[in-house]
Amino acid sequence: GLRSASLSNLDNRYVLDGKIYLDPRVNAKWALPRIGERKPLSIELSGGVGWHTKMPDISKLYPDLFYYDLIQLNFFSNENPAVNRMNVRTFVDDLTNYNLKAARNMKWEVRADFSIDDHRLLVTYFREKMTSGFRQGKSYTRYIYNRYSTEGLDPSTMTGPPDLADLTFTPDTILKVQSVHTNGSRILKEGVEFQYSSKRFPIIRTRLTVNGAWFRTTYNNSQPVYKRPSVVIDGRQIRYIGLYNEDDGYIRESFNTNFTFDTDIPRLKLGFSTSI
């Protein structure tokens, strides 16, 4: 099978604009010749491989604007409120990641099915890999502003707020971290699923079913990340940012098994099961 996915009516600045993703899927099944005559063994092998595309949602495509206020001047006097003045410079940033792509996932699996004398065993192994999953990444922006000096100003002799043109200032720079949506998640999933069902034993009219699975998930960052040290020298934080690979991640494993005893008593028209 083949499925296509695309987002329409996007701004041409998006890399997703006009891009079509194709998700092919192939399944195959092979039944081997039976082995034996009295109680023949049946074996079936099957498998499949395919792609799955997940598009970013509205919140990722159109994030809110980021507003950042920096105080350049804050002159205040209790005795003469008429001279009070504050000057704030506001920065407005667009946090849209126009390079955001769809998250692509490739999964394949194989299955073996064995049947003999009403006993059946199914074993499935699967593996799933995604290297472009969505996550919140960090982006640093440099903001340059002026810090005005109020040294030498005497509120008692002033008739109005200070004029910025008459004040000396020192240019300053601040690095601000922001959250942006990226394709920085790498996820690898693999596992084995199995199920065994026995024939119904005549004496106790009971059938045993055993099913379970083993799963393993590996999650980490597929893109470099920015980090800023928290060291403070002379009352100011260091203005350097480092770029590092894979600063986080984890591996999760789980295994579970379930035993079910299914009993049928036709004379009493009664059936019940017990699971452990």
Which functions belong to the PLM regions below?
Residues A5, K129, R147-S275:
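Gram-negative outer-membrane beta-barrel transporters
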Residues G1-R120, T124-E128:
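Structural signature of Gram-negative outer-membrane beta-barrels, strongest in the C-terminal barrel
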Residues Y14, Y21, W30, Y62, ...:
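Sequence-level detector for tyrosine residue identity
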Residues A5-D11, K54-K60, D69-I71, L121, ...:
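Outer-membrane beta-barrel proteins
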